[in-house]
Amino acid sequence: MARKAYQPKRRSNSNQNQQRSDSLKKNKQDNLRSKSAGNQQGNEKNKKDIQDQRNKASTKKKRESSGEKYESARDKVIRRFRPGDNALKQLRQYNQTPSLLIRKLPFQRLIREISTRMTEEDSLRWTSFALVLLQTVVEDYMVSFFEDANACALHAKRVTLMSKDLALAARIRGQKNVTGIFIPTKK
């Protein structure tokens, strides 16, 4: 006995269409009630509602044609980027900006913490210019180090940067005491 292949249920707009038709029926019923009752206020209210609906529809069309913002999130066109396009876009933005990439205050706290660990004095005093200069040097060093590590990954015919690439880049540079880099060993 052959089994049928699983076919997922397709979503349709029937629910939305049902809601629209229900609201139209309700409006028609309200119009008939107000006419039969002879209520002038109800007629004026319904006329205003109908005019408002027409105005909304016309402004929506105008917005779509003129390129203005859309009325709701459902009306937006979802744009999909190819994989890697957003990363390249961010890299271009970072290359164009002359500002520092690492936040200043966390970097200053780290420098002060390291300087208190290295010296026996209570605290060294740093000028703001010295901290900015140190930060630019550190960022340049990190960029060049990651470029070397990326070259090691490409040499291994990989795109993913791994810890062994960082260790190899540090070893080629002649840095023997590289801490924080875990090199897995095979048993």
Curated annotation (Swiss-Prot):
GO molecular function list: DNA binding; protein heterodimerization activity; structural constituent of chromatin
CDD domains attached to this UniProt entry: HFD_H3
Compartmental location: Nucleus; Chromosome, Centromere
Chain positions covered by the region annotation Disordered: 1-76
GO cellular component: chromosome, centromeric region; nucleosome; nucleus
Family: Belongs to the histone H3 family.
Function: Histone H3-like nucleosomal protein that is specifically found in centromeric nucleosomes. Replaces conventional H3 in the nucleosome core of centromeric chromatin that serves as an assembly site for the inner kinetochore. Required for recruitment and assembly of kinetochore proteins, mitotic progression and chromosome segregation. May serve as an epigenetic mark that propagates centromere identity through replication and cell division.
Quaternary assembly: Component of centromeric nucleosomes, where DNA is wrapped around a histone octamer core. The octamer contains two molecules each of H2A, H2B, CENPA and H4 assembled in one CENPA-H4 heterotetramer and two H2A-H2B heterodimers. CENPA modulates the DNA-binding characteristics of nucleosomes so that protruding DNA ends have higher flexibility than in nucleosomes containing conventional histone H3.
Protein name: Histone H3-like centromeric protein CNA1
UniProt organism field: Tetrahymena thermophila (strain SB210)
Source species taxonomy: Eukaryota, Sar, Alveolata, Ciliophora, Intramacronucleata
Gene field: CNA1
